């Protein structure tokens, strides 16, 4: 039930915010030790310091990739999750008749991870990645290449003038490569020899 999941994630987010506020208040108060007293160890954090994550089982219900990515984007934005993990459903013998009898292709899980990366690090929105017709990612093309082929009007890109956001949408250019291109552009115009 999506509503129940969202309510529990919201409650978790509020608890994390409260714990962080409480920690800030405690850190602001001066610590006074009695003469001869040994300092105590700090209490373990209530929530994981690295952030919260969740997992989605892909293929256990009729949810398409667009729905899964929209849910992931909402979890990242509204609940500030650090990571969403995807696992392909694996059927088990004598399971409920409501569950599928066949597992989805493992490549679907891989494509969802690629799309998730585009959401988190490349500035893509969930509705840009998954196609509107059917809502399923292509198993033949990675999501960034599929997006580029669906938007030929955005290409070619001038590497000497394009902003970071536009360069991140070029297939084959990752975050580090774009950062290096931008640094090289400060020194001089880019040449073909610079790109090899």
Model-derived regions: residue spans:
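Short secondary-structure junctions and interdomain/linker hinges
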Residues: 19, 122-126, 174, 188-189
């Amino acid at each position: 039930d999506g509503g129940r999941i969202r309510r529990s994630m919201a409650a978790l987010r509020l608890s994390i915010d409260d714990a962080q506020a409480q920690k800030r208040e405690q850190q602001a108060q001066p610590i006074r030790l009695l003469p001869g007293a040994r300092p105590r160890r700090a209490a373990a954090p209530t929530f994981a310091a690295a952030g919260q994550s969740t997992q989605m089982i892909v293929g256990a219900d009729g949810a398409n990739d667009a729905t899964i990515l929209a849910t992931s984007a909402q979890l990242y934005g509204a609940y500030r999750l650090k990571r969403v993990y995807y696992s392909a459903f694996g059927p088990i013998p004598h399971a409920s008749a409501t569950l599928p009898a066949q597992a989805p292709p493992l490549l679907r899980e891989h494509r969802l991870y690629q799309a998730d990366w585009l959401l988190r690090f490349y500035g893509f929105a969930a509705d840009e990645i998954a196609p509107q017709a059917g809502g399923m990612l292509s198993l033949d093309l990675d999501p960034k290449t599929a997006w580029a082929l669906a938007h030929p009007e955005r290409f070619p890109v001038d590497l000497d003038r394009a902003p970071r956001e536009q360069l991140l949408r070029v297939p084959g250019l990752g975050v580090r490569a774009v950062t290096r291109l931008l640094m090289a552009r400060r020194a001089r115009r880019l040449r073909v020899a610079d790109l090899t």
